[in-house]
Amino acid sequence: MKKLGTLFVLFLSVIVLVACASGKKDAASGQKLKVVATNSIIADITKNIAGDKIDLHSIVPIGQDPHEYEPLPEDVKKTSEADLIFYNGINLETGGNAWFSKLVENAKKTENKDYFAVSEGVDVIYLEGKNEKGKEDPHAWLNLENGIIFAKNIAKQLSAKDPNNKEFYEKNLKEYTDKLDKLDKESKDKFNNIPAEKKLIVTSEGAFKYFSKAYGVPSAYIWEINTEEEGTPEQIKTLVEKLRQTKVPSLFVESSVDDRPMKTVSQDTNIPIYAQIFTDSIAEQGKEGDSYYNMMKYNLDKIAEGLAK
């Protein structure tokens, strides 16, 4: 009997351990999923789908460059503890100094189990003349159709980790993507009415290739991506010479870059900088562009206004 009692205790212990190990952090357990997003854009899309069902940490601060970043001790801790990690992929956080690759490796996280690229399924555009892995243009979110892909990928992984809240996530996803889709369609109509000779988006970084393809507006830039030299005299000279051959009425400068190179271009061409726009980050809470939807609406409105001058 003593032997049987011992075996029963061991059996019960195993059952308890298995139950603890297999339990999901969902509404049933009373625990929220711990979710990490690499930047403010992905964090905002996640928040629109998950609401208060998760504990969310965004790594790269608002207004900072996600191409090359040095994670803080808090970022390392949050990543190590995370149930789910969302990153952009396509050469954003894994290009440059590869800060994200190092972060998840040190946190002992596994791709497609613990961390997921929200850009999965996007029709990738490459940097000019560099159609190869590691040379992808990462700025897919600047096409609202890709923002919808991001949202669907996020909702899919949230539902997989937290099935008890699947209906909640799917309801929010539908409402959110309908809103993005409406803005996308309205914006395409708006750009169709701008004269062809004025259609050129001029920015500091060449981040608007996805935007250009979506809304039928070519783009020009000083430098192609933030991981290369930025605003050299040769880069500025090349753009100035190009702009002198056009009738483009306005220039734009991004919120997360040094505006001095674009000011030089403006002075040399007598083309005014019409507005500051958003690429790699949303704005601070309470300011124009303080969500993914708001930053895209702001960009689309300002670019259309500037090119219609």
From Swiss-Prot:
UniProt organism field: Streptococcus mitis
Name by which UniProt lists this protein: Manganese ABC transporter substrate-binding lipoprotein PsaA
Subcellular location: Cell membrane
Keyword ATP-binding carried by entry: no
GO biological process, one term: metal ion transport
Highest taxon in the source lineage: Bacteria
Lipidation (S-diacylglycerol cysteine): C20
Lipidation (N-palmitoyl cysteine): C20
Membrane topology: Lipid-anchor
Alphabetized GO MF terms: metal ion binding
Chain residues that bind Mn(2+): H67, H139, E205, D280
Matching Pfam families: ZnuA (PF01297)
Predominant location category: membrane
CC terms in the record's Gene Ontology section: plasma membrane
